[in-house]
Amino acid sequence: MDYISDDPNLSDIKSLFEQVKLGKASNASTLSSVLAARGNYTVFAPNNDAVRAYVQQLNGTTDLSSLTEEQKQQIALNCIIDNGTSNAYESADFPIGGNTFSTSNLRDRRLSCTQDSVDQAFVINGDAKCIETNHEVSNGYLHVVDHVISPSTNSVAELVQKAGNMRIMGRLLALTGWADSLSVKTSQEEAYETEHINDAGSTKRFVNTNFPYMEKRSVAYTAFMEVDDAFINDWGCPAPEVDGEGNITNWQAIEDVIVSKCKENFPESEDDTHTAVDLTNMKATSNPVNRFVAYHLLYGGMAIDEFVHHFNEYNYDMVNLDAPVARGYSVNVWDYYATMGPNRGLLKVTQLPTGDYPFYLNRISTYDDGIKGTYEERSAVETKPGQTGINLLIHPINDLSGVTYDNNALNGFYYPIEHVMVYNDETRTLLASERMRIDATTLLYELQSQDCRGKKIAYFPNDYFANISNVSTSTEIYYLQDGLCDNKGSWKDFQGDEFLLTGRFDFVLKLPPVPKAGSYEIRMGASLNDQRSMFQVYFGDSPDRTSPIGLPIDQRESVSMIPGSPWVDDSGLSEASIRENDRNLRNQGYMKSPNYFTVDGSKGLTTTRNATPNSPALRRILTTQYMEPGKSYYLRFKSAVEASNKQFMLDYFEFVPVSIVNAVEPEDIW
């Protein structure tokens, strides 16, 4: 704060910092007090010219006294990032290419960064050029910008509709009613904050760590949107012709092609929920055009670097447990998400470890996956433009038409794709051709909207997540990330994070959809230790109607407790011996942890497969069930011990087609 006070060109932002408080409490500190205290802060301070130009634009005067309290907060809070325990951002740490800073600002918005094509200066949020950088102070870095940082207040749908190269998707969002579903729902957010206002700022003590109470539940979305050229080139749509008011004058010709193509890709007389298809009303969720659009939409607003979580994948050296480096990636990393609507689809996002680390939708790959392999990608199924939804490149910003359009909305993000994405039978078949390993965080989409995954630890009230229901009153839900808890390092979790549920827990978890009808083996992965619990698992197609599957599972066991002692450290054994040991372990309902991820802090070299037999990482085979797309399935977990301080560990699941389980070639160890 001293630097700002000493610079007369920053007097306006200094004045606002002295007026604006951090938080709604009556005793909340002003930003000037916050910035004068210890911490790690990144400040993009607008100079006086920038502040006055912004105030003039808002209120027709340069007088700061004309600003409302909301306007003052908008200016002041948007330019500050609280980096917490991590280092503040100097310019060498800035993301480029339209990617966003990994930590949100004080308005819970992720800020993008590009470089000016002329002088290579950094540009924040599309128009705030850094005219001075890297003023290092005792508690962070200050950068001076020439515009006030003011992220869009439009919804995701509104930004799509404003993009001049997405007129077709913008119109389809409106006609199908999905634009209304993507609207800003601040009333829900405010209701949650009001209900839990007395818990704001409080913590719960658990596993020797103070867990902050999750005081917000933001409602946000992610959309993948075709540019107009995708429909023109892939489906033969006419190019949109637009009048002076922005209306598409040849819409009927475009709609005719869209409707025809959607019928081709969804030819069934019933949708996945066995509802008769409505061919006339696009707002009916069984309508083929509605289903086409819905497959592009996700609950949870994610900046592009939040699609996957890098932490302990094979051969990746994260360097820092509390802030893994965003470089040196080694293997493909992916996650799965359920799309919106009653006809939930399964959408896979993969990041490659090469080049600029691009992201792809529904990339189906083959790997060097032998026992002595490296898991490097060998090949990927090629894109068939307009015919499938396979292997589509995601663009981080919308600049595909020579003009940059804002894709960072108040309630989420949209990302351009250059080919039409369809969830037809070929796409589903390819998705169902591989083992689906799904992290628990992606099942609980509210986490995606809180800028929490991999960055924060938290305690959640037991009614927080839509996909966790029928929760007993004594159940407590915690989210943990290695590096952020007091007990850090040497974890054996997939992606380095986990949920722990304690108390006399009893809850039901909604599972992701399967892409094709068929029989699937369902597995649950966990890192075991003597603080865990024992529980009964139930399966069913209704949260209120589940049946027990198998015997109770004990997450406290060591490998010596498995009947017949089939677990063997096979790191020096022959391939034949390894396969035999794996079969013996499967016969008891267990599998070793995948070779794909490693013990935290081992620089990606010590895989969890053979680590610490007294507290192993294992997969339990829960059940094999016939499952259909369009139907919802649930697992219930009920504590089987009296102790209320024991932990149920929720990490990841695998859904494996029986064609892989029963194949002649044994399943890979990855």
Regions found by a protein language model. Name each.
Residues 52-128, 244-399:
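Aromatic/histidine-rich interaction motifs
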Residues 1-104, 118-120, 131, 152-193, ...:
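Acidic/polar, low-complexity intrinsically disordered N-terminal segments immediately downstream
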Residues 35-37, 105, 116, 136-137, ...:
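Extracellular/periplasmic catalytic domains that process cell-envelope and extracellular macromolecules
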Residues 20-21, 172-218, 458-504:
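Conserved, compact domain cores that house catalytic/ligand-binding motifs in diverse enzymes
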Residues 44-54, 136-151, 224-234, 404-423, ...:
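FKBP-type peptidyl-prolyl cis-trans isomerase
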Residues 177-196, 233-261, 541-571:
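Internal, charge-rich low-complexity segments
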Residues 372, 376-388, 420-670:
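Extracytoplasmic
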